[in-house]
Amino acid sequence: MIFKEIDIDSYKELRPFFNSVDYEACEYCFTTLYMWRDMYKTSYYIEDDFAIIVGEYEGDRFSVLPLAKKDKIHKAIAFMINYFKNEDHRIYLRAVTKEVVELLQKDYPGRFEYIEERDYFDYVYDAESLRTLKGRKNQKKRNHLN
């Protein structure tokens, strides 16, 4: 199995897979993966039903959730587990949804440790609040603009 490095042309290949998931973290956006590709040595592998994205950080190999439709997620996760096993790497998943944690706990009981890494959570903003900057909560932002 050959993983390809992410480049600008990868978008066309990966786009259908990004469109097939409803994950709402920045790791599931092609632009983010492309922007950070050198820092995280991001690469991908495409199978008929799914795409696997892997990277490296501080010497540890990691993956985000497979890009797969819900009815193919079991197959994609099994593939990913085998990949890490064959490469003799510990399985390290990032940006995992609660739904997939429940799936992993059910399908692979006791196999994984689940740790919330608060430093890696995405920021979520209310668009209307940022547009108007009303209220005390946005006072510093308003003052910065003035």
Residue ranges and their predicted role:
Residues 1-48:
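Amide-forming acyltransferase catalytic core, primarily the GNAT-like/NAT-type
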Residues 6, 48, 66, 126-128:
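Structured loops at beta-to-helix junctions and adjacent beta-edge loops in soluble globular domains
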Residues 17-20, 79, 83, 103, ...:
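Residues that form generic nucleotide/phosphate-binding pockets
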Residues 29-99:
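Conserved donor-binding loop and adjoining core beta-sheet/short helix segment
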Residues 89-107, 118-121:
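Short, glycine/charge-rich beta-strand/loop segments that flank catalytic centers
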Residues 109-146:
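Acyltransferase donor/substrate-recognition loop-hinge adjacent to the catalytic core
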